């Protein structure tokens, strides 16, 4: 759930939203957009290992960053912005929190109170009782419908490891597997790819259900080798580090075929790519 920290900065560090939202001089821009292969009817996008990406969840969206894939906030990004990115040859990923409730989302009141557990460490966010799939599935389906209607190619579902946290519910690994597979199905049923966010322990069981992985700080915590099943399956691992400079992870990242960038914790437009 490391990524959920970044959205809280919308409230605790509002001045960040007033900062300049360009890629900045540290973005080498070596990931030029390219022509993607045409998809056959019923075929969904499958990013290969080493695909470059941009990850921006806060601030005014900067569509000038030279990356073939943009991972952006599903609620705050408009259909028109998605269209601009796709016209420029970019693939787009819709960020959603599927394992935790956020009080700042427009559909927050649709979630019954007894679905909400303990806070996940960030103001306004609480773990969801993912065992209650009969109630959660229609709520999440509406969010995935939104992503599809806006034209997104894929979904990044966040907070996919509640069973490993103090959620307020007796969640098990089996509960998490069931829920994560449901989330993957919701995306696939709508023709979108889907990424497994963190949840390293369940990669062996879930690599076949997901089309790519999204990981934070595997280099800092010496965990990147655990993402190898995705690479071996021909699936991209979109990886970000916050506290390490590129000189400390890029050599190993390139050798492992990870799609690695350095980001700030607020996940604004700034990034630094591997040279």
Task: Cite the ranges covered by each PLM segment.
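Residue-level signal for mature regions of secreted extracellular proteins and peptides
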Residues: 14-15, 267
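Bacterial signal peptide processing site
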Residues: 22-25
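C-terminal motif of bacterial Sec signal peptides marking the signal peptidase cleavage site
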Residues: 17-20
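Bacterial N-terminal signal peptides that target proteins for export
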Residues: 1-10
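Compositionally biased low-complexity segments, especially N-terminal hydrophobic helices
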Residues: 9-14, 27-30
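Glycan-processing catalytic domains of CAZymes
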Residues: 29-275
